[in-house]
Amino acid sequence: MAGYEYVSPEQLAGFDKYKYSAVDTNPLSLYVMHPFWNTIVKVFPTWLAPNLITFSGFLLVVFNFLLMAYFDPDFYASAPGHKHVPDWVWIVVGILNFVAYTLDGVDGKQARRTNSSTPLGELFDHGLDSWSCVYFVVTVYSIFGRGSTGVSVFVLYLLLWVVLFSFILSHWEKYNTGILFLPWGYDISQVTISFVYIVTAVVGVEAWYEPFLFNFLYRDLFTAMIIGCALCVTLPMSLLNFFRSYKNNTLKLNSVYEAMVPLFSPCLLFILSTAWILWSPSDILELHPRVFYFMVGTAFANSTCQLIVCQMSSTRCPTLNWLLVPLFLVVLVVNLGVASYVESILLYTLTTAFTLAHIHYGVRVVKQLSSHFQIYPFSLRKPNSDULGMEEKNIGL
């Protein structure tokens, strides 16, 4: 598996023909954030590789996730009667979240500024974004947590899926239309949540216990905003863009079945993970919510990355992500009845396997495309083909 090549020769040829096409109509992005990013990008030296900026932002998101996992492992820290997350942690998380969002906004501008734009850069950016979804949602959950003043772990599980499906819809659109319509919800959510983290440090988590309108709690507003944004903005706009392309006869695929193929694995992942929760003899989501969320988010990111590769290379998306086979077997075993400790071992084993498999997939795809385009992923220096090929062989990946 060390030298396994995930990107086929057909897909590599498709990447050679790829041209970036995106539409951003979000007023916040157009009139506030882009001017801000245009100023910020000038701070970066011209020798700094865009992918290094992208990866740095991703690492900040992961750091926030780990920091909050340390102070709030089971999502009870914001509940009454429990030891709360220190105020300085909220400030750090808020600042780092906004910095990560800023880095995600300037990486493409740095690529154009240094004349180093490649399909690898876009794939690297959007691939990491797909994994960031679970880190972002789970970290935000600590603001309210579970308990009498929060939301249940199952409700958060459903909200996580709302975010995941909202993310993949944009890439499903591009798979079918050839154009990436950037979602409005991303910019709004990043700016809002960064602000809310800081406010939490100032007013304390107790401020979120109180109703802000009649008996409508802030946790209800949190839930309503996520669902409302998905149902009233993301989904309608995705369907509108799809049907516009259908009406203009510009869809890349002629079959409804083929158009829906990219959504099969994510939907199956939702069905299997939900079945596990409902059939779990030990109530696995209550026992290990953070690990379960991470397992789902990692498997989802892997399916999304496969879609992005196919979308960018104009090749057919695989119907089934094979990571779902072991998940199916685990759900089958759980349904037959197992001891609580066995189910926990299965969850941790599966999560570890998914994580290693996804990291391997990402590393191999980046190395393949780096070799194909004759570039280094984290440097603007240009290697010759012999040196790059020898380097990859020596690394043994």
Swiss-Prot record:
Pathway membership of this protein?
Phospholipid metabolism; phosphatidylethanolamine biosynthesis; phosphatidylethanolamine from ethanolamine: step 3/3
**Bilayer-crossing regions:** 47-69, 84-103, 123-145, 150-172, 179-201, 221-243, 256-278, 291-310, 317-339, 344-366
Q: How does it sit in the membrane?
A: Multi-pass membrane protein
State the GO CC annotations. Answer: endoplasmic reticulum membrane; Golgi apparatus
Question: What's the top EC group for this one?
Answer: transferase
Q: Where in the cell is it found?
A: Endoplasmic reticulum membrane
Q: Which Pfam families match?
A: CDP-OH_P_transf (PF01066)
Q: Which UniProt keywords apply?
A: Acetylation, Disease variant, Endoplasmic reticulum, Hereditary spastic paraplegia, Lipid biosynthesis, Lipid metabolism, Magnesium, Manganese, Membrane, Metal-binding, Neurodegeneration, Phospholipid biosynthesis, Phospholipid metabolism, Selenocysteine, Transferase, Transmembrane, Transmembrane helix
The EC number(s) attached to this protein equal 2.7.8.1
What tissues has this protein been observed in? Widely expressed. Abundant in brain, placenta, liver and pancreas, followed by heart, skeletal muscle, lung and kidney. In brain it is strongly expressed in cerebellum, followed by the occipital pole and the frontal lobe.
The catalytic activity, as recorded, is:
CDP-ethanolamine + a 1,2-diacyl-sn-glycerol = a 1,2-diacyl-sn-glycero-3-phosphoethanolamine + CMP + H(+); 1-O-alkyl-2-acyl-sn-glycerol + CDP-ethanolamine = a 1-O-alkyl-2-acyl-sn-glycero-3-phosphoethanolamine + CMP + H(+)
Listed result of changing R112P: In SPG81; loss of ethanolaminephosphotransferase activity
| Gene Ontology terms: biological process | ether lipid biosynthetic process; myelination; phosphatidylethanolamine biosynthetic process
List every position bearing N-acetylalanine.
Answer: A2
State the Gene Ontology terms under molecular function: ethanolaminephosphotransferase activity; metal ion binding
Q: Does the keyword Lipid biosynthesis apply?
A: yes
Report whether Lipid biosynthesis shows up as a keyword of the record. yes
* Known function: Ethanolaminephosphotransferase that catalyzes the transfer of phosphoethanolamine (PE) from CDP-ethanolamine to lipid acceptors, the final step in the synthesis of PE via the 'Kennedy' pathway. PE is the second most abundant phospholipid of membranes in mammals and is involved in various membrane-related cellular processes. The enzyme is critical for the synthesis of several PE species and also catalyzes the synthesis of plasmanyl-PE, a lipid required for proper myelination and neurodevelopment, from 1-alkyl-2-acylglycerol.
Q: Which disease is it linked to?
A: Spastic paraplegia 81, autosomal recessive: A form of spastic paraplegia, a neurodegenerative disorder characterized by a slow, gradual, progressive weakness and spasticity of the lower limbs. Rate of progression and the severity of symptoms are quite variable. Initial symptoms may include difficulty with balance, weakness and stiffness in the legs, muscle spasms, and dragging the toes when walking. In some forms of the disorder, bladder symptoms (such as incontinence) may appear, or the weakness and stiffness may spread to other parts of the body.
Describe the family membership recorded for this protein in Swiss-Prot or TrEMBL.
Belongs to the CDP-alcohol phosphatidyltransferase class-I family.
Q: What is this protein called?
A: Ethanolaminephosphotransferase 1
Q: Which species?
A: Homo sapiens
